[in-house]
Design a protein with these regions (language model features):
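Single conserved hydrophobic/aromatic residue that forms the stacking wall/gate
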Residues: 1-12
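Active-site beta->alpha loop and helix N-cap motifs at the rims of alpha/beta catalytic domains
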Residues: 14-77, 82
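Alpha-helix-loop-beta-strand connector modules within alpha/beta enzyme cores
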Residues: 15, 24-40, 94-114, 166-196, ...
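Glycine-rich beta-to-alpha transition loops that act as phosphate-gripper elements at the mouths
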Residues: 46-48, 121-127, 194-208
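Active-site glycine- and acidic-residue-rich loops that bind
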Residues: 50-63, 90, 119-139
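Glycine-rich phosphate-binding active-site loops on the catalytic face of alpha/beta enzymes
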Residues: 80, 146-152, 204, 210-237
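Glycine/Thr-rich beta-alpha phosphate-binding loop at enzyme active sites
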Residues: 83-93, 136-194, 234
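Catalytic cores of alpha/beta
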Residues: 125-138, 190, 204-221
Length: 258
């Protein structure tokens, strides 16, 4: 159930409340599709626990998907905030995260091929906890961070509480998330001194948002809500804007020897 709406007093600030969870046809159906992948495409495996998985089995959920998808994807995004349907997620404290990550590191160590492991985090984390997650990246074989997932916050929405209650729980994505997503990426980039890749995601609705995200320290970006609203033309718009900026910078730079 995706609820699309306009809000914040501006028709251009669009958002989605995602109540569908990580709905898909399952691990083995995904593998069947990935066997026919195009070699030129870079494919990431975004994996999270099943909604009904008991706490004691969460790490086993992640490891099962990691092991089975390992030969079919180019990198992994470990979604530690994967529940869109309820106001809850995998804990982001170090002990819980390492309980998930360490078996993945151990499995990867025994493989001939290296698959980068990135941790996807929530925008609802307080800043001190974002710092702890960044420090975890610096002190473990973690390869990077994906920032951020959707938010459970409804801050700033003009929709009345009664209507929001009728819509139900779910993660909010889109324009209301832009500022916080960029703030989180900037914080991670500064704390890690730009030494690790960050995939910026959240509220990227146009080329301006993408340029701001890259300026904050993102190495790559991902699109979701903006793509739903704008379609494939958004990708063309972003690429054209980045190419134009690069051309302008090149023409403004002094020629060698001058």
């Amino acid at each position: 159930d995706l609820r699309m709406s306009r809000g914040l007093g501006d028709v251009y600030k669009r958002q989605i409340i995602n109540r569908s969870g990580l709905n898909n046809k399952g691990l083995y159906k995904a593998i069947a599709q990935l066997r026919h992948r195009h070699d030129r495409l870079i494919i990431g495996g975004n994996i999270g626990k099943n909604t009904l998985t008991q706490p004691s089995q969460v790490a086993a959920d992640y490891l099962k998907m990691f092991r089975n998808l390992y030969q079919y994807v180019d990198y992994f995004s470990i979604n530690a905030c994967c529940d869109n349907c309820a106001d809850g997620s995998v804990s982001h404290n170090k002990a819980h995260l390492m309980n998930i990550l360490q078996p993945l590191f151990d499995f990867r160590r025994g493989q001939n091929q290296y698959r980068p492991i990135l941790l996807k985090i929530s925008p609802d984390l307080p800043d001190p906890l974002i710092d702890e997650v960044t420090d975890l990246m610096l002190s473990t074989p973690l390869d990077g961070i994906v920032a951020v997932n959707g938010t459970f916050s409804r801050k700033g929405l003009e929709t009345d509480e009664e209507t929001l209650d009728e819509i139900g729980s779910g993660r909010l994505s889109g324009a209301p998330l832009t500022q916080r997503a960029i703030e989180v990426v900037r914080r991670i980039h500064r704390r890690s001194h730009g030494a690790y890749p960050i995939i910026g995601v959240g509220g990227l609705m146009n080329a301006r948002d993408v340029k701001a995200m890259l300026a904050a320290g993102a190495s790559l970006v991902q699109l979701y809500t903006g793509y739903i609203y704008e379609g494939p033309s958004l990708v063309k718009e972003i690429c054209r804007a980045l190419i134009d900026d690069a051309a302008s910078e090149a023409s403004a730079s002094p020629a060698p020897g001058k």
